[in-house]
């Protein structure tokens, strides 16, 4: 179903939820494995997370660590549902044009959480696909114009 979405390019990143207070330790563990930190940000609005983005090798081989800023964060709720443990938060796919991908997925009847593409971290535009569609949460992301 995703291979029929116009402009679908590749896996952009895998997001991992981490418990409050564990972000720095997790980031250091990935750095010890050879990852390089390329971005760090606090994201407010509906997401309410502290994010560290790490890359290994060339290309978009990215891990995004997400720590909830408070108990109302969707990531805090995910950790709670996961028995108090961190783990897979979502898999993100890069697209060439976010609006085209959004419209194509809507036309296919895919259950999209967001009403429209919205700002994400790093200046990206994103939307999320409900986990019931594929068995896990999917983020669709368009990089900012350079």
Language-model regions, residue ranges each:
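N-terminal beta-strand motif that seeds the catalytic metal site of vicinal oxygen chelate
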Residues: 1-28, 86-93, 144-146
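Vicinal oxygen chelate
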Residues: 2-7, 50-55, 61-66, 93, ...
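A cross-kingdom feature marking solvent-exposed beta-strand/loop segments within repeated
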Residues: 12, 38-39, 44-48, 70-83, ...
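Conserved active-site tyrosine of GNAT-family acetyltransferases
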Residues: 26-31, 105
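Acidic (E/D-rich), amphipathic helical modules within compact regulatory domains
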Residues: 31-57
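Ampipathic, surface-exposed secondary-structure segments
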Residues: 63-103
């Amino acid at each position: 179903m995703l291979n029929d979405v116009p402009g679908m390019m590749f896996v952009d990143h895998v997001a991992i939820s981490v418990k409050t207070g564990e972000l720095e330790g997790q980031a250091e563990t990935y750095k010890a494995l050879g990852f390089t930190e390329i971005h760090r940000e606090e994201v407010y609005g509906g997401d309410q997370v502290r994010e560290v983005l790490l890359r290994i090798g060339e290309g978009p081989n990215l891990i995004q660590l997400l720590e909830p800023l408070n108990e109302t964060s969707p990531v805090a709720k995910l950790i709670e549902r996961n028995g108090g443990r961190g783990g897979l938060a979502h898999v993100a796919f890069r697209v060439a044009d976010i609006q085209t991908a959004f419209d194509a997925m809507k036309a296919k009847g895919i259950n999209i959480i967001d009403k429209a593409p919205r700002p994400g971290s790093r200046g990206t535009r994103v939307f999320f696909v409900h986990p019931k569609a594929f068995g896990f949460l999917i983020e669709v992301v368009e990089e900012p114009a350079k």
